[in-house]
Amino acid sequence: MKDTMKPLTYDQKLFTLPGNSTDYDVKSEQSDLFKNVPNASHVVLFFDKEVKVRFNTEVMPLAILPISRSPFQSPTGFLEIKNLFLTEANGDDVEVEVWLW
């Protein structure tokens, strides 16, 4: 029987989101993300402080992710994710880990 499994590709990055960042463009600032997976179907975000995220563009509504939601995992079929925009408004640096596939 021929193997019909599609190879799994992913991207992963650990970085520090500077405090007081507004719409931090993850794709531009972390250039090794979205390389293997330019259009992700799933995202997992780990963070050590509350963050706000917009998916794909800066005009989308902010999704507030309190620390109790870490890790945040997008639901199956959530949407095609081409970029992330992160906001931190309390002046604290945030350790962020992103997984895309």
Where are these regions (language model features)?
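Beta-sandwich interaction modules
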Residues: 30-35, 61-81
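Surface-exposed ligand/attachment interfaces on beta-rich extracellular proteins
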Residues: 16-37
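Noncatalytic modules at the cell exterior or secretory-pathway interfaces
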Residues: 40-43, 76-94
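Short, intrinsically disordered N-terminal pre-domain segments
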Residues: 1-20, 99-101
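Short, surface-exposed beta-strand/strand-loop-strand elements in extracellular ectodomains
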Residues: 44-61, 97-100
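Short tyrosine-centred short linear motifs in exposed loops/low-complexity segments
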Residues: 19-21, 51, 92
